[in-house]
Amino acid sequence: FPPVILFSILTLIAFYTVNYNSKVDENQLVILSHIKSDKNDKFDKILFDEVMVAAAEYQDDDPNKQKLNDKAMRSFEILKPASMNQDSTWTYIFIADPYVEGALYNIMPSLKQKYGEEGAEEVFGRWSECFTDDGQDAYFTKRAEM
C-alpha cells in the first residue's frame, strides 16, 4: 500500500478498536500528581511496591462495598511520565474510567489495613514528601460523544 493509504487504514482501525470503559456522560476521575524533580524514582517505588499493593489487597467488611472497590480497581489506570516536565517536575496521571460512586479512592484505609496505623503513617509520610507544593489536582470529567 502507498503510505497515505496505509496511514488511513491504520488510523481507522485505531479509532474503531478504542475500548472505552465509561459510557457517554458517565463520570471519570482524573488526578494529576505533581512530583518533585529528585523524587520520581522514590515516588514510583512507593506507588507500585506499597500503595498499589495495599490497594489491590484491601478487603472491605461490607461485601457490597467490596464489589464497588473491585470494580474501581479494574477501572483504574496509571500513566507514568515519559520525561521530566519543563519546570523539572514529574506528573503522574491517575484515571478512574469510569468513576465508581461509593468505591474507596482514599489510600489511607488500604495502607492501614496492610501496614497497621504506624506503618501506614510512615508510608504516607514518605509518599507525601515526593509531592511538589502543587500536590495533586483532581478533576471529574464525563466522556463526550464522538
Residue ranges with predicted function:
Residues 28, 40, 44-48, 108, ...:
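Extracytoplasmic/secreted envelope proteins and their assembly/folding machinery
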Residues 1-20:
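Bacterial Sec-dependent N-terminal signal peptides
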Residues 15-26, 55-93:
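Short, glycine- and small/hydrophobic-rich beta-strand elements in well-ordered beta-sheets
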Residues 24-37:
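Acidic/histidine-rich, surface-exposed loop or edge segments in extracytoplasmic proteins
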Residues 36, 45-56:
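Sec-exported extracytoplasmic/periplasmic mature domains
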Residues 5-6, 32-35, 117:
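Alpha-helical interaction segments
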Residues 38-41, 53, 60, 84, ...:
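Surface-exposed, polar/charged faces of alpha-helical domains
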Residues 21, 79-146:
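Intrinsically disordered, low-complexity terminal tails and linkers in eukaryotic proteins, enriched
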